[in-house]
Amino acid sequence: MVPVLLALLLLLGPAVSEETQAGNYSLSFLYTGLSKPREGFPSFQAVAYLNDQPFFHYNSEGRRAEPLAPWSQVEGMEDWEKESALQRAREDIFMETLSDIMDYYKDREGSHTFQGAFGCELRNNESSGAFWGYAYDGQDFIKFDKEIPAWVPLDPAAQNTKRKWEAEAVYVQRAKAYLEEECPGMLRRYLPYSRTHLDRQESPSVSVTGHAAPGHKRTLKCLAYDFYPRSIGLHWTRAGDAQEAESGGDVLPSGNGTYQSWVVVGVPPEDQAPYSCHVEHRSLTRPLTVPWDPRQQAE
């Protein structure tokens, strides 16, 4: 589930920027609620991230906040009983909001999804940004603007949500204080337990493979995997000249705290020029070049 959730997080807010990867830090939360849960997909789940690394999760079945590795081995980082109680309270409010939206649209029988993402960033130990937004069935629903401060409705049903969440002036001030004070404070508290993991550099392993059907062009694939941080440069060269990839280029989580990426080029049958995969990553002292050996051809 984590890779899918991380993709949603990137859509909902700027929690994991390349600048963050360069030494700044972020704390963010992703909530997902389902009107019709099914096996393996509970009605509510929450995942918390430090930078791009999930560090605890919670769902409506276990109703406990549970730290993920390597934070599961850390003592004193968080009071997990207290965090569990907080997540249970947030679950109740979150699912009540989903129910209100379904009532507004008079669709209690449909299958609907409500998602929320919020968090903050530190740069040089100072607050440098924050976000808080929700989506309903994949469409923007409501967001918090801390500069006004106010909830900004992005859907007709969100007018009701705004009225409810702004019924008392203190509600808005609490949301603003959370983004500007509480969230950065939590992040500062977590960092002494987390910097070693978040600042680590893991070099990519690189594999080049090829396949050709009789009478067709040869397809070369360069796969880089098990690298961290996320940013990587990856391309094929022909006799030293960079080639445009036919496919690939995305950087995806591997599920173990590292990333993977690949690029594919097509080579005409008559082309005998040397091809190499060129890799640039922060963990490497110099770019890595891995030549394609035609003897490795996979039939």
From Swiss-Prot:
Disulfide pairings: C120-C183, C222-C277
Stretch forming the signal peptide: 1-17
GO cellular component, one term: external side of plasma membrane
Sites carrying sugar chains: N24, N125, N256
Compartments reported by the entry: Secreted
Keywords for the protein's UniProt record, in alphabetical order: Disulfide bond, Glycoprotein, Secreted, Signal
Taxonomy, superkingdom: Eukaryota
Stored SUPFAM superfamilies: Immunoglobulin, MHC antigen-recognition domain
Domain Ig-like C1-type: 204-289
InterPro entries (UniProt xref): Ig-like_dom, Ig-like_dom_sf, Ig-like_fold, Ig/MHC_CS, Ig_C1-set, MHC_class-I_related, MHC_I-like_Ag-recog, MHC_I-like_Ag-recog_sf
Biological process according to GO: antigen processing and presentation of endogenous peptide antigen via MHC class I via ER pathway, TAP-independent; antigen processing and presentation of endogenous peptide antigen via MHC class Ib; immune response; positive regulation of T cell mediated cytotoxicity
Family: Belongs to the MHC class I family.
Annotated function: Stimulates lipid degradation in adipocytes and causes the extensive fat losses associated with some advanced cancers.
Subunit structure: Interacts with PIP.
Record's protein name: Zinc-alpha-2-glycoprotein
Record organism: Bos taurus
Encoding gene, per UniProt annotation: AZGP1
